[in-house]
Structures are given as C-alpha cells and as structure tokens.
C-alpha cells in the first residue's frame, strides 16, 4: 500500500493505492502554518474513518508546488509512518524528457500529469489542469515535454473581479443558460465561465496547430482538476476528463523510483 500526496496552492489531495488500484482519496486544505502533528492527526483520522491500517503503508510520494509546507509534511510522514517520503524533483526518474529552457522551472504537478498521461495514453498530448492556476502542457508521443501555458484559474479570476470591483458580488461558478444575461449575477457568471471556455478553446487549438507543425499526429486533449468537467464539456475540444491523473502520475513515478526509497 502506498500513500500519494498532491500538494496544491489550495488543497492537498491524498490517495491510497493497493498495487494499481486507487482505494481511497481525500482532500485537505493547504495551510503552511499547520504543524506536522496537526497534519498527522488529520491524516490518521482519515485512515481511521476509512478503516485503513497506516502501518501497512510501505511507501509515500509527494508532489508539491508549495515549498513552505514541505518541512511539516515530510516531518509528518517520518513521524507517523516511519518512512522517508519520495519527493518529486530533480534527480527523480520520470520517463519523460523535459525540453523547457530551464527544466527546474517546471512545476512538479505539471511533470506528474505529463508522466501519467504519457504512460496511460501513449500518444501526442495536450494536458489541461484546472487548479488555482490553469496549466496547459504539450507532450510529444515519444515523451518529450515541450512546455505550455499558465493562466489564472477560474476561481482566481472570479475572486479578483469581486475584490477589485466594489459593486460586483461574489458569485457561484456555474454555467448560465445564456450568454446574454439579464441580471448582474448571471452576467458575471456568463463572462467568467463562457470567457474561460473561450480561452481554453483557443489555447488548445493553437497548441494543436503548433504540435502538428512539428510533425506530431492529432494530439489527445486530457483535462484534470476540480473544474475540468464544468469547462471541458462546453469547450468541445477536450477528449478525456481524468480526475485522478495527478494521483496516477505519482503512483507511476513511485514505481519507477521505488528502489531509491529507504
């Protein structure tokens, strides 16, 4: 049994794998002020509520885009699981070739998603991760990670509008029935949701063109992240929604590196 942790700016997603099967999945809020013991108590409670034995965990892997939280999480893993966690970063075997100008700049989450999608789908790829930031990544069929685009997540965009425009309210992120709306709340929802859909459509089509200009076949477009379903279904050019892509990538990377885990 292995424990995988995907640490994002807003949430920490945890998963338990028995071989290749995801048997449990949990979500905690990301808080850099929380101590190792506070995280440890939370995680132990999650194991208890799902009737899982933490002593059966034989390996742990962490991907994080929040450096300031890592001391607490690594200390928690060592104290409560008696394991040195594997951390996604330089020196880790991934099976993909990073063609970024500076490979160290590529976020761990983007690498993990690329590993999972390359392993699962085995073709040219565009990967979209709808998180605090929305990332678009292009991967050749041979596993070359070419780069991509980063933009504010849809929730960040919505919050920025609420915070900077005094008379505009915070709204629920749902798709209105029409683009032409007759009240302020629906009008904001229209602008945010349909505007974001348009952004996704254009970036995907532009990346498809650039990949095909380099000789790649028609890429498969894979989406993941909390708001993938809301945006992808309307964007029309997303082929697959895989909500567990990042967790799968962590499992795959763990298997590639398990001899290094002490």
From Swiss-Prot:
Residues the entry annotates as binding ATP: 6-13, 132
Cofactor note: A monovalent cation. Ammonium or potassium.
Organism (species): Clostridium acetobutylicum (strain ATCC 824 / DSM 792 / JCM 1419 / IAM 19013 / LMG 5710 / NBRC 13948 / NRRL B-527 / VKM B-1787 / 2291 / W)
Annotated catalytic residues: 109
Documented EC number(s): 2.7.1.33
Predominant location category: cytoplasm
Protein name: Type III pantothenate kinase
GO terms for MF: ATP binding; metal ion binding; pantothenate kinase activity
UniProt entry keywords in alphabetical sequence: ATP-binding, Coenzyme A biosynthesis, Cytoplasm, Kinase, Metal-binding, Nucleotide-binding, Potassium, Transferase
Protein family according to the UniProt entry: Belongs to the type III pantothenate kinase family.
Chain's gene name: coaX
CDD domains hit by this protein: ASKHA_NBD_PanK-III
GO biological process terms on file: coenzyme A biosynthetic process
Catalytic activity: (R)-pantothenate + ATP = (R)-4'-phosphopantothenate + ADP + H(+)
Pathway assignment: Cofactor biosynthesis; coenzyme A biosynthesis; CoA from (R)-pantothenate: step 1/5
